[in-house]
Amino acid sequence: MTTRSALTPAGALGWLATLSIDVRAAAVLDAAGTVLAGDPALAGAGEGPDVMVARSERHAIVVRTGPRALKHLLRADLRAALEGLDIA
């Protein structure tokens, strides 16, 4: 899956919200860890049972999930959102 168009940080989170089930919170960070959009509480979160992180050289997206999240699909959605962020 790919967005094939540029996304703003807020746009990336909105796009993810339309695709992914049971995402409780999300944030987009820049390479330095500054929150560009979303929940600032996720800035220091690491990968765990209910937290997924996807990174590129320029951005990171962190999501906190609930028990119904389809994590394999969410991982693909996160990669596509990162692609859209990195196009911008």
Per-region residue spans from a language model:
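Non-catalytic interaction/Regulatory regions outside core domains
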Residues: M1-A88
